[in-house]
């Protein structure tokens, strides 16, 4: 089996992981952890979400985190924006990269953002135009690609329509998210190969380990030529629509897999694991990842 020779991981724990934690993490602690992640060799780190602090108190210090971190020559910092105001905040804070998110499933769109898929698409077009005008690289994340309430309840035709619609708007990357962990290795390959027929924009996969198939799905994606993934330290994260669900596939688990396959990442896994252990101690509980306690 031929795999990519190199894989790029984006660490999303400081955003997608931290936002689910009710125990507020002090700004200086977040900054110290992120700085250690930078030193571990992670090429991309999603460090904040530009949302209302009442809705997500953990992200109330987004600008402060960015200001205290400054720049890191070897690492791209990005933030998640859910509306035009969020894009403006990301640009004003000095980020060079922003992640945007739209629904592919009508029920998920109304549950999560209070808007239809078409409304989300129109808003995304405005956000992309603003972000590119402000000089930021844009990644568009499409949610629940493999299903929302049950596997397959998001039409693949809609995913393909969105991939085509946004193929010539200047995106840096196009991310397919298994937001509720509905994918399996066969469906991963079916969707990835279909999307590749309609867009040349680089693909990123954002996989959750909700049902224990995260690593198997990574292997399936590698077999389909995907070489960029979102991962989260220690497996931090979750899904607001599935109580008790685990989060993103764990960074340490993915790095261990890639190392064992001879695929280069440039990441020092023991350094990431050290941060995860400190996060675990701070939160007072074990994390869902496997390797963070072993390396």
What are these regions (language model features)?
Residues 1-295:
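Catalytic cores and adjacent flexible loops of soluble metabolic enzymes
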């Amino acid at each position: 089996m031929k795999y990519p020779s190199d894989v790029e991981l984006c660490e999303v724990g400081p955003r997608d992981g931290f936002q689910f934690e009710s125990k507020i993490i002090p700004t200086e602690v977040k900054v110290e952890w992120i700085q250690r992640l930078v030193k571990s060799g992670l090429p991309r780190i999603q460090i904040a979400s530009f949302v209302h602090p009442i809705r997500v108190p953990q992200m109330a210090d987004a600008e402060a985190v960015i200001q205290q971190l400054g720049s890191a020559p070897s690492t791209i910092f990005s933030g998640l924006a859910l509306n035009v105001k969020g894009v403006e905040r990301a640009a004003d804070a000095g980020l060079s990269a922003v992640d945007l998110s739209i629904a592919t499933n009508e029920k998920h769109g109304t549950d999560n953002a209070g808007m239809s898929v078409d409304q989300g698409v129109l808003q995304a077009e405005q956000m992309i135009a603003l972000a590119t005008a402000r000089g930021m690289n844009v990644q568009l994340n499409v949610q629940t690609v493999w299903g929302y309430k049950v596997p397959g309840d998001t039409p693949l035709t809609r995913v393909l329509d969105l991939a085509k619609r946004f193929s010539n708007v200047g995106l840096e990357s196009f991310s397919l998210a298994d937001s509720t962990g509905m994918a399996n290795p066969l469906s991963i390959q079916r969707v990835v190969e279909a999307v590749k027929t309609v867009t040349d924009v680089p693909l990123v996969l954002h996989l959750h380990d909700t049902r224990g198939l995260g690593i198997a799905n990574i292997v399936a994606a590698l077999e389909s030529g995907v070489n960029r993934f979102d991962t989260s330290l220690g497996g931090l994260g979750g899904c607001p629509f599935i109580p008790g669900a685990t989060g993103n596939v764990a960074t340490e688990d993915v790095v261990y897999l890639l190392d064992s396959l001879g695929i280069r990442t440039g990441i020092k896994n023991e350094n990431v694991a050290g941060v995860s252990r400190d996060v675990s101690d701070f939160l007072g509980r074990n994390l869902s990842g496997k390797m963070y306690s072993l390396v």
